[in-house]
């Protein structure tokens, strides 16, 4: 069984911005998971999970005006990093280990190829950092997914350190794993 949105949403941190994208390019941005209308995407399948910079209203109480342009030049919006979840009507042909719980081996093929992952063990909160998805070793494969979020990356490349705005390039994806299921 493939991963559906109704399953993955249980693991996404409540305090991160989200960009829900569809394979056709249409997307909707949310400040928090709680802002997504209940069951809106539950029937859709996860195609991928990553990080992206997306536009948000400077006034969190209003919806940004549609610019109608490919290049957004509105003074009413700002770009902010978000967890990106790409959804599809049809599941990807990825075999899961089991349908009862989400193991890291089942999540890994859906993760963005790179950059900057922190894999955290919930039991002792130790972490290891990996630049690319392919660098994450198999030793985590049988661990249960406990959470997915984003945090500031302390070892940002020099170019991005000097940028005075918030961007996904200053973040890393955090994947919390546990020996026990959630």
What are these regions (language model features)?
Residues 1-28:
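Ordered, small/hydrophobic-rich secondary-structure cores
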Residues 2-4, 32, 102-103:
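Short, structural beta-strand-to-alpha-helix junction motif
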Residues 7-11, 36-44, 104-112:
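Short alpha-helical interface patches
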Residues 22-93, 115-177:
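Acidic, low-complexity, intrinsically disordered interaction modules
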Residues 91-102:
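Intrinsic disorder/low-complexity detector
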Residues 181-182:
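Short acidic DE-rich linear segments
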């Amino acid at each position: 069984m493939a991963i559906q949105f109704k399953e993955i949403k249980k693991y996404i941190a409540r305090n991160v911005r989200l960009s829900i994208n569809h394979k056709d390019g249409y997307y909707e941005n949310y400040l928090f998971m709680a802002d997504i209308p209940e069951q809106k995407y539950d029937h859709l399948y996860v195609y991928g999970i990553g990080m992206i910079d997306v536009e948000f209203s400077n006034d969190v109480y209003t919806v940004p005006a549609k610019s109608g342009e490919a290049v957004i030049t509105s003074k009413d919006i700002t770009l902010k990093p978000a967890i990106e979840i790409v959804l599809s009507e049809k599941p990807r042909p990825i075999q899961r280990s089991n349908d009862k719980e989400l193991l890291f081996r089942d999540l890994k093929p859906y993760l963005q190829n790179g950059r900057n992952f922190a894999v955290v063990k919930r039991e002792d909160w130790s972490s290891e950092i990996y630049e690319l998805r392919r660098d994450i070793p198999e030793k985590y494969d049988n661990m249960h997914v406990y959470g997915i979020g984003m945090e500031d990356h302390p070892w940002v490349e020099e170019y991005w350190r000097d940028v005075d705005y918030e961007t996904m390039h200053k973040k890393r994806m955090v994947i919390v794993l546990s020996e026990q299921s959630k």
